[in-house]
A protein has these predicted regions:
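Short, acidic/hydrophobic/Gly-rich beta-strand patch recurrent on exposed beta strands
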Residues: 15-16, 30-32, 52-55
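C-terminal structural segments of small proteins and small subunits
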Residues: 45-76
Length: 76
């Protein structure tokens, strides 16, 4: 599943980063978005972008465009 499709309150475990742009890939890796990390959607801005997520005991705001490059499996 593409992580840009997650709804508020849903959790997913990152399985793959599909990013050809090394700069964006490095940026996400530097922020802790790595394979195996658990992500929870905390809130979504009124216009749908950006998305506030929680991972590794901190929160980040990511654009939907960046989240669309991250694959994961939903955790129930």
């Amino acid at each position: 599943m593409n992580l840009s499709e997650l709804k508020v309150g849903q959790r997913a475990r990152v399985t793959k980063l599909n990013i050809e742009n090394r700069e964006i890939s490095r940026h996400l890796l530097d922020m802790g978005v790595t394979r195996g990390v658990e992500i929870k959607v905390k809130k979504i801005a009124p216009m749908g972008d950006p998305v506030d997520i929680e991972l590794r005991d901190y929160e980040l705001c990511l654009r939907k465009a960046d989240l669309s490059h991250i694959e994961g499996e939903v955790i129930k």
